[in-house]
């Protein structure tokens, strides 16, 4: 890695440690020419599958869209941002674990519902009512009854 201070080509790693629950490596480096020290962070670049929408169109996976939908469902609910980020990362891991280049939007929606069910039941019902297009109060009641079992 080039030195950010003098642009020298040679640097050496002084210290390496795992951070971000083991998903990132923090490296402390020293330039062999100017002896300045600096920190770098390294993480795997993982490709997310494309999403096949219900109308048949395809689009790249959009993490912000995923996070936005979850945040909307959890609005004014007592769930920490840390728990939300863990949920987003869990959904992304599940999608990558399929090993597929493309996944149906229904799979993404079902993963979101599963995650919301474990985070907050009210948010789950909010999301389910939109995702499953509830038509009347009876459908809300049926979904709530399933949760109470």
From Swiss-Prot:
Zinc finger (unnamed): 3-34
Gene expressing this chain: nrdR
Domain ATP-cone: 49-139
Comment on bound cofactor: Binds 1 zinc ion.
A single BP term in Gene Ontology: negative regulation of DNA-templated transcription
Keyword DNA damage: no
Family label: Belongs to the NrdR family.
Designated name of the protein: Transcriptional repressor NrdR
Functional description taken from the UniProt entry: Negatively regulates transcription of bacterial ribonucleotide reductase nrd genes and operons by binding to NrdR-boxes.
Reported cofactor(s): Zn(2+)
Organism: Aeromonas salmonicida (strain A449)
Superkingdom to which the source organism belongs: Bacteria
One Pfam family cited in the UniProt record for this chain: Zn_ribbon_NrdR
Assigned keywords, A-Z: ATP-binding, DNA-binding, Metal-binding, Nucleotide-binding, Repressor, Transcription, Transcription regulation, Zinc, Zinc-finger
One MF annotation (Gene Ontology) recorded for this entry: ATP binding
InterPro entries: ATP-cone_dom, NrdR-like_N, RNR_NrdR-like
